[in-house]
Amino acid sequence: VPVSAVRVEVWSDIVCPWCYIGKRRFESALAEFDGEVEVEWRSFQLDPNAPVGRFQPTPDHLAAKMGASREQVEGMMGQVTAVAAEVGLEYDLMNSVSLNTFDAHRVLHLAKSHGLGTVAHERLMRANLVEARTLDTPTLVELAAEIGVPAQETERVLAGDEYAHEVREDFSQARRYGVSGVPFFVLNSAYGVSGAQPTEVFAQALQQAAQG
């Protein structure tokens, strides 16, 4: 059976610990897949109502959002940190900083226009979840420059509302697909894989999509 190229769209948020784990498991499946795959990262906000410009320690943010105790939050973070370690990610969630990620997603779309969408997604996830960086404007400019997006372009984009439309388009498309949580993978606009599934689930989905 001839294997055709597979197009994968991934809805993800850069503050989502399971999205980064899902990315690693998906990459393991990609490494073993013979066919050609084109990956496009799409924007999704776990917390679209987070106040813009407010940076809050993630444990405090989660405790308030979920009505959970600090101990419960620490327990949950410990569990996800252990899973992340299995795919080679060293999370520092207790020190991580939550924020409204809309501007970060605009930067991701700017990076995508330079052909750096996947690299940018990786860099911002690592900055938030592993390095516990505060993703304010200067930091977004610096991280984008690190991967090859000129600083003045990022500054210009963040000073206005460029790429806001593209980010909202991703949200609309997610709603059309019925995406309620991330990561969410759509293969050839036909097959959906929800969550940070085991690598073999992604491998199976890739085979299925490739065979049409």
Q: Residue spans of the language-model regions?
A:
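C-terminal cap of thioredoxin/glutaredoxin-like
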Residues: 3-11, 15-37, 41, 108-212
